[in-house]
Amino acid sequence: MITSNDQRVLFIAIGKQLRKNIRCIAFGGTAMMYYGYKDETKDIGLLFENEPDRAEFIRVIETMGFSEGSPFKIYIDEKLRDPHRPLMYMREDARFDLFVKQIFHTVTSPNMKEDKFARHEFKGTHQLTVDALRKEFIVMLKSVTERDKDFEDILTIIKKDTQFNWQYLIDEVLWQHENGDTWVLMDTIKMLHELRKYMFVEQKYLKMLTGKLGKKQAKKK
C-alpha cells in the first residue's frame, strides 16, 4: 500500500529527475488521499496528455526500480480488451496505473481540464505538475474502472462528503456519453443501483441516465 507521504516522496523524487515539464491528472485513490478520504491506496492512477509525457515519466520510475507489470488480474476482461487500457508499473507494494489521453472510453472533458480540486507541483530542473480531480469525477471514473475496492471507495466519498454534487456528476456522465463513451452510462447506472442499497440517492438522478439509455436503445430498433 502507498501512504500519502509515500506518494509525496515519490512525486518529489520523480520531479527532480525529469528532462521536461510534465503535467498529469490524478484520479482514484491518489486524488482521494489529497482530499483526506483515505490514508493509503493500492495504486497511483495518473492520466497524461500525450505519449511522450508518459514515456518520460516511465523512464524516470524505471530508474527507481519500477518494472512493467500485467493488468490482467486488476481489470475485468472487457476493460482489458480496450486499446486505452493503462500501462502498469510496480515496485514491491507500490503500483502506477498510467493512462494517456483517456481512461478506457472516458476522455478528458472541458470540465476536467478547468475545474480541478487542487494542483501540486514538484520542482527539479523541470517540473511535475499533478492536478487532482474533483470528487464527482473520481466517482465517475471509479464506476468505469470497476477494480477491486472501487465501489467501496465510492461509498466512502459519498458518506464523507455531504456536499457531493449529484447533478454535476450526471451532467459529466451525459457529456461523456454524447462524446463517444459507450461504457460510462451503463457503468454509472450500475453503480447507482448498487449505491442505493446502502444510502439514499434521489431517484431523479438515476432516471436522467436510464432515460438517456432508453432513447439510445430506441434509436437502434
Placement of each model-derived feature along the sequence:
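Compositionally biased terminal segments of proteins
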Residues: M1-K221
